[in-house]
Amino acid sequence: MSFAAAQATYVLHSRPYKETSALVDFFTPLGRLRAVLRGARGKAGALARPFVPLEAEWRGRGELKTVARLESAGIPNLLNGQALFSGLYLNELLIRLLPAEDPQPEIFAHYAATLPLLAAGRPIEPLLRAFEWRLLEQLGYGFALDVDIDGRPIEPQALYQLLPEAGLEPVAQLQPGLFQGSELLSMADADWSAPGALAAAKRLMRQALAPHLGGRPLVSRELFMNRKESPRD
């Protein structure tokens, strides 16, 4: 995969590297890549922040590349409060789930469209659920919400459990972690006004993502929970 030509990109994460450089995880339509940004204390370092539309060129054939050029390509998406933690959550999902240098133009486009909506104060939960669902689908982990694992239509009054590698399985007895058929059908229609639909979608996405996150907790989620629990002045 060649990254020599200029590419639209976003910074997912950056950390200091050696004396004046930074090690940066970028997300482009051609995939996720890691590169050394030299002179990170100067203008380039000021640009290399999450949620800022950028254009970049890279050098190098190995997994670790070098940033050859980095320029602003649009208005920064200024995220604050819960929107900021949500943006960090999306970035962490991309770092944890995307294979390196695997082209994902659809995910990139969805990400680029989601950031301005977060910055504009749009309701956060529907945005996160839509992004999680698109990510699962594009990576080949998606499943149907309107039919069960045997191809039968989801029944509104029935109960279902998620088998992450297969789909939704009907169950006869009540147990933890189940989903009402009516909730699943609301998710299929993206009808977030239906009672319980958003809460059920959050549980469903957690169950669907968990096998692919390797058992390690999400740092962004822990940061958000710590913020909620911190006493306020």
Swiss-Prot record:
The keyword Nucleotide-binding does not apply. One of its GO terms (biological process) is DNA recombination. One of its GO terms (cellular component) is bacterial nucleoid. Transmembrane segments: none annotated. Keywords: DNA damage, DNA recombination, DNA repair. It holds the Pfam family RecO_N. Involved in DNA repair and RecF pathway recombination. Belongs to the RecO family. PANTHER family: DNA REPAIR PROTEIN RECO. This is DNA repair protein RecO. It comes from Pseudomonas aeruginosa (strain UCBPP-PA14). The gene is recO.
